[in-house]
Amino acid sequence: NNYYNNLPTKTYDFSERHMEYATSRTFLNGVKNPNTTTREVGSGGNEFYAIPYLTNGSGAINESEMPFENNEDKISISKIQNKTVTSQVFDTVSFEASDSEENKNIIKNHVKTYGSVAVGIHGAQINSEYYNSSTGAIYCDDADNARCDHAVSIVGWDDNYSITNFNAKHRPTNNGAWIIKNSWGTSVGKNGFMYVSYEDVNIYLQTYGIVKSSDQINYENIYQYDYCGANGTFETDGLNGSPIYLANIFDKKTSGTEYITQVGIYSTEGYTCKVYVNPNGTGKNKSDLKAVKLKTGDSQTFDMVGYHTLEFLNPIRINADSFVVAIEITGSDSDKVSYATELQWDDEWADVEIESGKCFVTTKRFE
């Protein structure tokens, strides 16, 4: 990142309140937000809400457009609408839930190269014997009763951070700690920062980062069905080295001239992807689909789990009222591949809207 490379940096102040409300369901007078789960304001959140918010065009917006207020009142849904989105997230990463040296090094490299990593800790331990208030050091070894319930950010690390800094009742075996930034003000920890042992049982369970983003919005429309993001996984086996194909049919939103410039996908494993487009209608046969040249060439490979954007070398004009986008996926296992979907589940995903005849998967390239 720019700070690490001693380059000019820019500080952004995005609206937490907008994310809180834009990812919630019920507004004033019982009005429902159609593009989210059943989550309500004040009920907490996690990456399953935050990452789709940043990748589906809902946000982020500047703090000045919807400033923080210390309340959870019902508001008019108009308060979250027609805001100026000021950031676009292209690629994210989900790290392994592992305390291996390899995974720790991957996280360190991400912090050094791209910036902070979102993680979870057991927040209640701040008032428990897992925390040393004099040093701001946290080490939890209770995997059964002290689970993740609070989100923080890894902003650095200290391989030599001594075990003597931790509460004497619960100390890790080895030195070393992540430096985390909390959201509880400067009076907690060391001016708002804390040290979490590399051996903490929660620190690797929910780890996510942003790989590529921009403060320039270079699109007018996003075509999508999965506003709530990836919440389920399917697997196709017996492939014997063959890829699978995912396709969506979209209806053009305007009567004006539009071009497709990029396609997004969530990878559940290592993928190599190729993109095909039919800009002339809803046909999905091989003869209908045109191979797209990407900025990376004929294909693009992703090694890490997460949301990814495949950028076109040249824009493709939409010539009909409907069009098709298809992605060919080759997974890391030659015999099977998993892929993510947005599913209608009980509880928070019970109201997810699923449209029939719009999304397809096949192993035969729609022949």
Explain the meaning of each model-derived region.
Residues 1-8:
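Alpha-helical support elements that line or immediately flank enzyme active sites
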Residues 2, 13, 18-177, 181, ...:
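Predominantly the structural core of cysteine protease catalytic domains
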Residues 38, 78, 292-294, 335, ...:
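Short, intrinsically disordered low-complexity segments
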Residues 204-216, 309-312, 355-365:
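Short, surface-exposed secondary-structure junctions/capping segments
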Residues 220-224, 346-367:
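Low-complexity, Pro/Ser/Thr- and charge-rich linker/hinge segments at domain boundaries
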Residues 270-355:
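Aromatic- and Gly/Pro-enriched, solvent-exposed loop/edge beta-strand patches characteristic
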